[in-house]
């Protein structure tokens, strides 16, 4: 990992592979297996050349997935192998060691394998694996047996009815009459139901039409009233003899604490408005 990687503290026991337990032949497991015909060094099961070493158990103290450490150890981890710049570094080392061609071929083969076997590659399946499980003979035989069973059941049920029934003709005629009566009742019910449905549709259409007519009458009446109001307004404006004179400003009432100021402003305005008074002030003679 290097200096930038996370530091993992490893703990090794006195006997990490538990060889003291596996080599101790005086225990119950060894004695029981030997009584069943097993000998030390043999594999378990039908195949004798299977693995003969015991399974190593390791404590999982990290959050990585199962098998991540094995993939990293075998060099098949994508995160480790796909790091940028490692291929160039391997080529440089190969040239320095005099094995540049071998390293280039190995890296090229590795790149091709990643493309073919990677997530963007394709995995083909043999055609023999995709054979159909349809068997025409067995299917036809199954259909034939099913039809035979059904016909046998029908024959047995009809035989039982013939044996148990003592009034065949009378029951059949009464049953036919009942069926005809039920059918006639059903037809009358359906007819009355259809009539009620048609009547309901007609009443709904009539109500919709009446609502529409009322709405149109109301709109026409409102338009007429608006038009009459507009015409009346125009007539009143035309019949008026003279336009309304603008309202004159009321004189300021000299009431209150501002009466003296109002009086002074009024006198000043009057003197300014008088041309003769202005000529006398500015000593202009005409």
Curated annotation (Swiss-Prot):
One of its GO terms (molecular function) is telomerase inhibitor activity. Pfam families: G-patch. Keywords: Nucleus, Ribosome biogenesis, rRNA processing. Residues 25-71 form the G-patch domain. It is found in: Nucleus, Nucleolus. GO terms for cellular component: nucleolus; nucleoplasm; small-subunit processome. This is Protein PXR1. It comes from Meyerozyma guilliermondii (strain ATCC 6260 / CBS 566 / DSM 6381 / JCM 1539 / NBRC 10279 / NRRL Y-324). The lineage of its organism: Eukaryota, Fungi, Dikarya, Ascomycota, Saccharomycotina.
């Amino acid at each position: 990992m290097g200096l930038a990687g996370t530091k993992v503290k490893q703990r090794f026991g006195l006997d990490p592979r538990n060889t003291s337990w596996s080599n101790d032949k005086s225990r119950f497991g060894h004695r029981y297996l030997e009584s069943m015909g097993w000998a030390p060094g043999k594999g378990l099961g039908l195949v004798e050349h299977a693995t003969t070493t015991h399974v190593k158990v390791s404590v999982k103290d990290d959050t990585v997935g199962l098998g991540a450490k094995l993939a990293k150890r075998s060099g098949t981890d994508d995160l480790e192998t796909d790091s940028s710049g490692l291929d160039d570094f391997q080529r440089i080392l190969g040239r320095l060691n005099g094995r540049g061609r071998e390293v280039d071929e190995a890296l090229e083969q590795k790149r091709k394998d990643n493309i073919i076997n990677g997530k963007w590659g394709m995995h083909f399946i043999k055609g023999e694996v995709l054979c159909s499980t349809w068997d025409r003979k067995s299917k036809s035989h199954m259909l034939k047996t099913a039809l035979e069973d059904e016909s046998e059941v029908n024959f047995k049920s009809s035989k039982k009815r013939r044996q148990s029934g003592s009034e065949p003709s009378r029951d059949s005629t009464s049953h036919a009459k009942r069926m005809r009566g039920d059918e006639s009742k059903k037809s009358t019910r359906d007819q009355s139901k259809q009539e009620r449905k048609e009547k309901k549709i007609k009443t709904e259409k009539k109500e919709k039409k009446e609502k529409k007519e009322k709405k149109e009458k109301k709109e026409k009446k409102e338009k007429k009233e608006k038009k009459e109001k507009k015409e009346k307004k125009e007539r009143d404006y035309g019949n008026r003899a003279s336009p309304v004179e603008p309202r004159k400003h009321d004189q300021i009432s000299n009431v209150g604490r501002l009466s003296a100021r109002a009086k002074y402003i009024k006198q000043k305005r009057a003197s300014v408005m008088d041309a003769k008074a202005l000529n006398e002030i500015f000593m202009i003679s005409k």
